[in-house]
């Protein structure tokens, strides 16, 4: 008798995706982050669902409802902090996942990569709208500043901003629609994740060498299921340490003050995972230019397949590009630091230099180093 998992219409799909899936035998722990992101998404949807049961999306009661969740709901504090810090874990895994893709040349799977870039935008939009919901000072002013950037769009800008706000300022209408979008987007993200996996399974996984691994495949289960479980346990340990010992480490103290349109916080800044993009935005003195740079700082990922000049896919055997890659990582850390600093000397010039080098490394230096390495190997024939 044939195993039911190989014959049943539904189980067959699961079998081909997670059990009998042929996987390269040499993929390292950098390939764990896909499954970790899936777990993060599940944690966020579940904790978010339970939070939504007690949250009210009204300017008068939003802040109080979050306080009520933390004080009166059974384990409400745990659910709330798991959701808030779960977002941070989500972005840590996302950045490492994208970084892995850049290092090992996974962007040559064009469809998978482009869906991934769309997913990144969707997750960023969801996180931004979620940050507005507690209706603290930083929620309100963050929403005001970021939505206001759309007014830089010529001709339709102001109308567009007022349309998004649902009035002449960030108010009740804005909060209600942000809650609606924040609720629906994770389900759209889940659908996109399925498409992401669909495209990935068309080609099969990449591996650290960047070479074709068809000759050496192993079944996903038990080898990579057990490996993924180890990764999940490590991530959950880290998340729970954060939640139970340092729940406010990554948050902003200003968000413990109810939103007040008459009082601007001294330093308006987003959550840590947006700081690199915020630094790029602020480094350009022109409003429209800043907005374009902000969008391009993420959209540049979609250009990577076209900027690949080397005859090798991975950076594993490309020392010059490796150095540039790690300079880029350090550069992003500098941008993250600058994004959280006030707009004054010397932070302004550091931010501008870091922004220039960010785009230069990706658009100019890495493609050139790819050509140089090919020449050194006499592969440019």
UniProtKB/Swiss-Prot annotation:
Cross-referenced InterPro entries: Cyt_b/b6_C, Cyt_b/b6_C_sf, Cyt_b/b6_N, Cytb/b6-like_sf, Cytochrome_b, Cytochrome_b_C_euk/bac, Cytochrome_b_N_euk/bac, Di-haem_cyt_TM
Function recorded in the entry: Component of the ubiquinol-cytochrome c reductase complex (complex III or cytochrome b-c1 complex) that is part of the mitochondrial respiratory chain. The b-c1 complex mediates electron transfer from ubiquinol to cytochrome c. Contributes to the generation of a proton gradient across the mitochondrial membrane that is then used for ATP synthesis.
Record's GO cellular component terms: mitochondrial inner membrane; respiratory chain complex III
GO biological process: mitochondrial electron transport, ubiquinol to cytochrome c
Major subcellular location class: mitochondrion
Species name: Apodemus alpicola (Alpine field mouse)
Binding site for heme b b562: 83, 182
Binding-site residues for a ubiquinone, renumbered to this chain: 201
Cellular localization per UniProt: Mitochondrion inner membrane
Protein name (record): Cytochrome b
Assembly with partners or alone: The cytochrome bc1 complex contains 11 subunits: 3 respiratory subunits (MT-CYB, CYC1 and UQCRFS1), 2 core proteins (UQCRC1 and UQCRC2) and 6 low-molecular weight proteins (UQCRH/QCR6, UQCRB/QCR7, UQCRQ/QCR8, UQCR10/QCR9, UQCR11/QCR10 and a cleavage product of UQCRFS1). This cytochrome bc1 complex then forms a dimer.
Assigned keywords, A-Z: Electron transport, Heme, Iron, Membrane, Metal-binding, Mitochondrion, Mitochondrion inner membrane, Respiratory chain, Transmembrane, Transmembrane helix, Transport, Ubiquinone
Gene3D superfamilies, sorted: Cytochrome Bc1 Complex, Chain C
Cofactor: how and how many bound: Binds 2 heme b groups non-covalently.
GO terms, molecular function: metal ion binding; ubiquinol-cytochrome-c reductase activity
SUPFAM superfamilies cross-referenced by the UniProt entry: a domain/subunit of cytochrome bc1 complex (Ubiquinol-cytochrome c reductase) (SSF81648), Transmembrane di-heme cytochromes (SSF81342)
Family: Belongs to the cytochrome b family.
Membrane topology: Multi-pass membrane protein
Segments traversing the membrane: 33-53, 77-98, 113-133, 178-198, 226-246, 288-308, 320-340, 347-367
Top-level lineage group: Eukaryota
């Amino acid at each position: 008798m044939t195993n039911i998992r190989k014959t049943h219409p539904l189980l067959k799909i699961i079998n081909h995706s997670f059990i009998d899936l042929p996987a390269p035998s040499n993929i390292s722990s950098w390939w764990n982050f896909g499954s970790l992101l899936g777990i993060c998404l599940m944690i966020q949807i579940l904790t978010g669902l339970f939070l939504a049961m007690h949250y009210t999306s009204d300017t008068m009661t939003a802040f109080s409802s979050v306080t009520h969740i933390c004080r009166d709901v059974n384990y409400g504090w745990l659910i709330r902090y798991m959701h808030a810090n779960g977002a941070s874990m989500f972005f840590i895994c996302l950045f490492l996942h994208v970084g892995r893709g850049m290092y090992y040349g996974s962007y040559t799977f064009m469809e998978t990569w482009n869906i991934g870039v769309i997913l990144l935008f969707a997750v960023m939009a969801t996180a931004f709208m979620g940050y507005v919901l507690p209706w603290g000072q930083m929620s309100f002013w963050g929403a005001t500043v970021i939505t206001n950037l759309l007014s830089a769009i010529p001709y339709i800008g102001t109308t567009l901003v007022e349309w998004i706000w649902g009035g002449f300022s960030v108010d009740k209408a804005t909060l209600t629609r942000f809650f609606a979008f924040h609720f629906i987007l994770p389900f759209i993200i889940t659908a996109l994740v399925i498409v992401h996996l669909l495209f990935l399974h068309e080609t099969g996984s990449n591996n650290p060498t960047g070479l074709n691994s068809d000759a050496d495949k192993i079944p996903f289960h038990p080898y990579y299921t057990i490996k993924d479980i180890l990764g999940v346990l490590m991530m959950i340990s880290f998340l729970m340490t954060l939640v139970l010992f340092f729940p406010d480490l990554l948050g902003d103290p200003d968000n413990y003050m109810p939103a007040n349109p008459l009082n601007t916080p001294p330093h308006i800044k987003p959550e840590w995972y947006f700081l690199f993009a915020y630094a790029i935005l602020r480094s350009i003195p022109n409003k429209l230019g800043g907005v374009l740079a902000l969008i391009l700082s993420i959209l540049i990922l979609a250009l990577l397949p076209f900027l690949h000049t080397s005859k090798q896919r991975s950076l594993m055997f490309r020392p010059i590009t490796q150095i540039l890659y790690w300079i880029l990582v350090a550069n992003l850390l500098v941008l993250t630091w600058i994004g959280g600093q006030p707009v004054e000397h010397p932070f302004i010039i550091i931010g501008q230099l870091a922004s220039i080098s960010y785009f230069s490394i990706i658009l100019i230096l890495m493609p050139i180093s790819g050509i140089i390495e090919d020449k050194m190997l006499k592969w440019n024939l």
